[in-house]
Amino acid sequence: MALMVAFACGGGGGTSGSKGTIKIGSDLPVCTTGGQSTANGIKFAVDQKNAAGGVNGYTISYQSFDDCRQGAYSADAGVENVQTMLGDAKFLGMIGPYNSAVAKAEIPISSPQHFVMISPSNTNPCLTKEVPPPQAPCTYHAADLRNGNANNYWRVVTTDDYQGPAMATYMYKTLNIHSVGVLDDSTVFGVGISGAFDTQFKSLGGTVVKHSEYQKATTSDWKTILLGFKNAGAQGVYVGGTDDQNICIPRKQMKDLGWDVPFGGGDGIETTDCINQTSGNEAGVYATSAGADATKVQGATATVAAFRKAFPGANDFGGYTMQAYDAANALMAAIGRAVNDANGGVPTREQVRAQMAKTRGFVGVIGTYDFDANGDTSLKIVSIYEVQQVADPAQSTGVCGKTAANLCFIWKDQINYATT
């Protein structure tokens, strides 16, 4: 049975709604540091909303579901969590999931029920659209996931067809790397983002000396793969995958081989757990995140400071904490409009879905944005980070290690594909 944690929706300094309770949930891998820090953002948003009186007189009850099994995300666990929410009529929507492979499994069961899903972190483009050439075509299709039902899925982050190319451009042009070895973890996310990286890197004139893949269940030693990259002349390594698939352990093993070249990846490695996995070889790790860094967004300073006061733990703030905060607020705003549609009563899931689809000009901490008909955000920003030593982790713009607490992902740059 998947773990569920219920939060009694109060926050100091105000009175919650008195008309009753509306539930929202989340489906995240809270067994991981990244998953828990994302859940923190949702709880913070709900606490703030209830402290201000709730949503049109209703208290919002937030329940966090864990989709981990054996220390990693599980699509099967995610499906069970969504089924639990669907079975309780008080749930009107959810934040999540965290991983694209989980979304692929959840959309087909949530869509017929008009159940709103808003992901703070899914980046595989095929969840919402077809990928144009020269990138590899989708192996599954957004329309098939919805099976003729109205769209019920949105995300506040941009997609890997931007994220992969962003790191390819940064490695080629800024780090002056012209040959790389590419490794992916065989997941929906890992295969997709590494393929997008490949295409862009080659288009710039770079060489992918080898592209290898592995599966977590059967792999604990990457040295043979890494030696293949090294001997083929790779000047850097790009990895497509996530920390819970052990994608950052190869970085540690590079040190064992005496091979010191930059190690880049997507948002799946911009995590505390990745820094821990690199274990003594943290410097030289680069990562992208599929959105603006909230600490760099004008007007977000007060919200970030308030969050850190409420959640003061060293690893409570993560790469997608503020995206989750935005997603929760977008959902609660749609619920509020749906309450109006229901003449002040509890709305149906379809009323909430219809209002979510009308979201325009949403003002969040990561920017002001719309959603298109597919559920994608109008923001097309990719942030780039590097692991560096910092004097005060609390002032870091990224996430930090646990054991190596002063080694953090530090914001370096961003690419805005909406304006380029």
Roles of regions detected by a PLM:
Residues 10-19, 34-40, 52-140, 156, ...:
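Beta-alpha junction/loop-to-helix N-cap segments that form part of ligand/metal-binding clefts
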Residues 307-321, 332-399:
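Segments of small-molecule ligand-sensing domains
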Residues 91-212, 262-287:
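Extracytoplasmic ligand/sensor domains, especially the bilobed periplasmic-binding protein
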Residues 43-54, 83-91, 107-115, 122, ...:
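Sec-exported extracytoplasmic/periplasmic mature domains
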